[in-house]
Curated annotation (Swiss-Prot):
One of its GO terms (biological process) is tRNA wobble guanine modification. Its EC number is 2.4.99.17. Pathway: tRNA modification; tRNA-queuosine biosynthesis. Monomer. This is S-adenosylmethionine:tRNA ribosyltransferase-isomerase. It comes from Acetivibrio thermocellus (strain ATCC 27405 / DSM 1237 / JCM 9322 / NBRC 103400 / NCIMB 10682 / NRRL B-4536 / VPI 7372).
Length: 341
């Protein structure tokens, strides 16, 4: 299967540059994966499609202010770090810009010297492992001097950083938001719970690999970046009991979907665990846990459009995307939503 099989033509002006005023008033395309039938709704109408006894699975990660602007110790040359993932303790994998010359031993300073970093290793794709040095609590320093990194296709400044967090975000660690969840309000979640829908959580810390283009033509050769995930016992219990009672498992976002498919056994049973996943889901994949998916509209030729194509079929997805373009839906992180039922 070729990467170019997942291309569609998207006018630039349909890339949403800011969120809609009220989270649950974004548009919602409902796609029936069996029949291909499409309905046009508002996101708040999602309650019509989720039944008592179904289980909604949300990713409760929180985006960290992962962009750091600083300078090289000694020369004062400007540098930008983007934190990708914590390897252990104070060692992180980072993207450096400009970073070609940063050899092991190179040192950088951020925020009036309250945070320092030393390159300890060059890793794949030119990223660096760095060790941070500081007094106090790393997360608090990051909150003070870091910037939330918006996706490269969003050029407008975000007035309210909380709009790039889900209302249920809890565990800090992502370089990008799990954007399907941005449409939910607390009131909408309460309404679903009141209707007898179970709400379960997983954690997957989203890396910037989610925006990386697929560089191979045969997608079977593509290797995903690994991302940290965790699923707890109480959430496994909700998911497993839903399955046993004939309810549907509805993943909110490709990140939740990837966790569930990573941890599910051949019978669709999930067990509490944590680790790193590099699962790559594309057409031909047989889903073990996930029945339905709430997601945004994804970039052409991205691993995310491949994942939704695995669930609904490539032709149905590309047809739905072409209709979304005609109907002037808003695309990508701050855009509208799709429910694949």
């Amino acid at each position: 299967m070729k990467v170019s099989d997942f291309y569609y033509d998207l006018p630039q002006e349909l890339i949403a540059q800011e969120p809609v005023e009220k989270r649950d008033m974004s548009r919602l395309m409902v796609l029936d994966k069996e029949t291909g039938k499409i309905s046009h709704k508002r996101f708040k109408d999602i309650v019509e499609y989720i039944n008592k006894g179904d289980c909604l699975v949300l990713n409760d990660t929180r985006v960290i202010p992962a962009r750091l602007l600083g300078e090289k110790e000694g020369t004062g040359g400007k540098i930008e770090f983007v934190l990708l993932k914590r390897i252990n303790g104070d060692v992180w994998e980072v993207i450096l810009k400009p970073g070609k010359k940063a050899k092991p031993g190179a040192r950088f300073v951020f925020g009036n010297g309250e945070l320092k970093a030393e390159v300890i290793e060059i890793v794949e794709e030119g990223n660096r492992l760095v060790r941070f040095e500081y007094d106090g609590i790393f997360e608090e320093i990051l909150d003070r001097i870091g910037i939330v990194p918006l996706p490269p296709y969003i050029t407008k400044k975000l007035d309210d950083a909380e709009r790039y967090q889900t209302v249920y975000s809890r565990y800090k660690g992502s370089a990008a938001a799990p954007t399907a969840g941005l449409h939910f309000t607390l009131e909408l979640l309460e309404e679903l719970a009141g209707r007898g829908v179970k709400i379960a959580y997983v954690t997957l810390h989203v890396g910037l690999g989610t925006f990386r283009p697929v560089k191979v033509e045969n997608l079977e050769e593509h290797k995903m970046h690994s991302e940290f995930y965790r699923i707890k016992e109480e959430d496994c219990d909700k998911i497993n009991s839903t399955k046993q009672n004939g309810g549907k498992i509805i993943a909110v976002g490709t990140t939740s979907c990837r966790v569930l498919e990573t941890v599910g056994d051949e019978n669709g049973i999930v067990r509490p665990q944590s680790g790193w996943t590099d699962i790559f889901i594309y057409p031909g994949y047989k889903f073990k846990v996930v029945d339905s998916l709430i997601t945004n509209f994804h970039l052409p030729e991205s691993t995310l459009i491949m994942l939704v194509s695995a669930l609904a079929g490539r032709e149905k997805i590309l047809e739905a995307y072409n209709i979304a373009v005609k109907e002037r839906y808003r695309f990508f992180s701050f855009g509208d939503a799709m429910f694949i039922k």
